[in-house]
Amino acid sequence: PLTDEETKDVYQQNDPQVNKSIKGHKEAGFPKGWPSRFDTQFKLMKVLGFVYYEWGKPINFSQTGNYLADTVSIEIDSGAISREIVNPQNEQIAFMQAFAKQQRCNPFICELNDNIPLILLLEVIKKLNSDPDYNGSGISYKEIPLVIFWKDNDAESLYQRIKLLRKEHRYNPSNEVIEDICVNEILGGFKKFDLDSIVSEYPDEFVRKMRMTGLISFRGGGRFIDINHNEDDKINYILANYATYRKYTSKEEYFDYMSDIDGALFALKAVEIPK
């Protein structure tokens, strides 16, 4: 491990406030450099209602944040830090509630897309699985970009667009077809995106987050994303209680909403997430 002096030297050499040759990184409300990088790394934790912070003020963990933190036990012995997972179910339940509530357009992050991604995903999978034209295997990984780029919470229209995509290209549309639908058709071509981001990076990150809830699982060797039917009670509860949501303009009110524990949802038994 680094000594205190070595650690200080590393930070200073990479701090644009000290080393003027470094351009630095700037986030709104935070000074350029390490403070802004802190916000970049932890902003999602604020958006999900786990921890609230502002520059120059104390960092506050919410109830759900403390619940998530209790997933692990951390020991420090002679400068060595060890971590042990002691309550794995806490992580699943905390992220399940957070993603069930998370609005893409919120006071912390303003986006053109206005929906709750987890709910949109669950609803469109249910519609696809109920369609007699298909085999009930969920949504294709290649179709996930449409969920990510979809501008509203209209799962029926998204389902119909996926049906058309399957009619025209089966389950194997080209990357360029997906790019055209997402960028030109859905977003109207107002912004350019890297092709690899659309068909690989964004879907990988999205699916990884959704799997943290324990509500979805892979099928067909990872080619399809389906509902985890071991969690049908939770899924039905979430769709019944969170599909319709209130919009917030205040960061504090939105954070309070996100961090408030839903006792009924937390009371439902967690099923271990398959690896």
Where are these regions (language model features)?
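Donor-sugar nucleotide-binding helix/loop cap in glycosyltransferases
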Residues: 1-275
